[in-house]
A protein has these predicted regions:
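Structured C-terminal helix/loop/strand segments within mature extracytoplasmic catalytic/sensor domains
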Residues: 2-83, 108, 227-245, 269-336
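Active-site-adjacent helix/loop patches that line small-molecule binding or acyl-intermediate pockets
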Residues: 60-73, 143-146, 154-232, 240
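Acidic helix-start/capping segments at beta-turn-to-alpha-helix junctions
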Residues: 68, 72, 94, 136-152, ...
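Short, conserved catalytic-motif segment at the N-terminal edge
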Residues: 85-109
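Structural recognition of the beta-strand scaffold that forms the well-ordered cores
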Residues: 88-91, 113, 168-171, 180, ...
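Active-site SXXK
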Residues: 110-141, 286
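Short glycine/serine- and small hydrophobic-enriched flexible loop segments
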Residues: 122-130, 218-225, 307-311
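Short Gly/Thr-rich strand-loop-strand
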Residues: 243-264
Length: 336
């Protein structure tokens, strides 16, 4: 009986022991065990995939296209170089959205020849406009004024109105008429003082009678802007220097519709022409001096330069197109 009871007790206890041995996490089960330690920081870093390698940017080629003004300058330089002459060019735009100026050898000194008559006639116009001088005042010839020129009717006691002498000196570039006007103005010193007062600082007029393209342009710009007597002076001056006897320089490169107020000069292998040009909405001042080639070739160079500049001016826009940045997108309203 005792033996049977012991066996019964053994049968009851054995399953309980087995249950205890297989309880998860009890650690009682004998034999090899696998211990999983917590994941460390270094292990996690190794698990992160490496950042993609930066792809090298391809080089960007920027193409810079020359502007129309750059092309104009290059073309004028080519015309001057091909001529074989010394060439001075001075351009100042008086119209358009961007009033450019151009000077190629503009400060180089050239023999002025009759170009001194530009400031001379401007001085006369200013005096007429201010009332200091009368267009009908009679000015008389002095034998010391004589120089070969267009007219030959000067003699002792001959007198001419200021208007008559201005037309002779301007439209026909007559030398004796210009000498009479210089004398009544106050002589060469007075002429040079007047010229320097509005920017002709590199010129030595009359003697040795030199000037530059930039100086001649300065004279015309001041006249065109009304700084030398205003519209009254212009109304007196412009007809005197329009449709002259010498139109084979700057006017020859322009359309017949253009108004060209200008004055030429030529002597000792030098040709000068300086002008105020107006045609519709376009206006500008151009001065060109050429030295070192024969006279006919010199005028041809001036005409070619004039024509190329006109071609450029004709293609310029009439106004500036404003660049308006696009409006920034509006942010959605935040509702609370």
């Amino acid at each position: 009986m005792k033996r049977g009871a012991g066996r019964l007790l053994s049968l009851l206890i054995h399953p309980l022991l087995i249950g205890l041995l297989v309880v998860p996490g009890s650690g009682v089960l004998a034999g090899p065990t696998v211990s999983v330690s917590p994941t460390t920081q270094s292990t996690r870093l190794l698990a992160v995939p490496p950042a993609p390698k930066a792809v090298a940017e391809l080089p960007v080629t920027t193409l810079i296209t020359p502007s129309a003004f750059d092309t104009l300058q290059a073309d004028l330089q080519a015309i001057a170089a091909q001529s074989g002459a010394q060439v001075g060019i001075s351009l100042q735009e008086l119209s358009g959205p961007r009033r450019n100026n151009l000077s190629l050898n503009g400060r180089q000194s050239f023999y002025a020849a009759s170009a001194y008559k530009v400031p001379l006639l401007m001085a006369e116009a200013q005096q007429v406009a201010s009332g200091q001088a009368s267009p009908s005042e009679r000015l008389c010839f002095d034998p010391r004024d004589a120089e070969d020129g267009w007219f030959t009717d000067y003699g002792d006691g001959s007198c001419f109105t200021r208007d008559e002498l201005a037309v002779r000196a301007g439209r026909y570039s007559d030398n004796t008429a210009a000498h009479i006007l210089v004398r009544y103005l106050g002589g060469p010193d007075a002429l040079n003082r007047f010229a320097k007062s509005f920017g002709m600082k590199a010129s030595a007029l009359w003697d040795p009678n030199t000037t530059t393209a930039d100086d001649l342009t300065a004279a015309w710009v001041n006249e065109a802007l009304g700084r030398l007597g205003g519209t009254t002076a212009q109304r007196w001056l412009y007809p005197v220097l329009s449709h002259t006897a010498y139109e084979h320089g700057i006017p020859a490169g322009l359309p017949g519709s253009a108004t060209v107020v200008h004055k030429v000069g030529a002597m000792y292998g030098t040709e000068n022409d300086s002008a105020y040009v107006v045609n519709g909405r376009i206006s500008y001042v151009l001065s060109v001096s050429v030295d070192g080639i024969d006279e006919a070739a010199g005028w041809s160079v001036i005409a070619r330069i004039s024509a190329r500049i006109w071609q450029y001016e004709l293609s310029r826009p009439e106004f500036v197109v404003p660049v308006i940045p696009p409006e920034a997108p509006r942010q959605p309203e935040t509702r609370y």
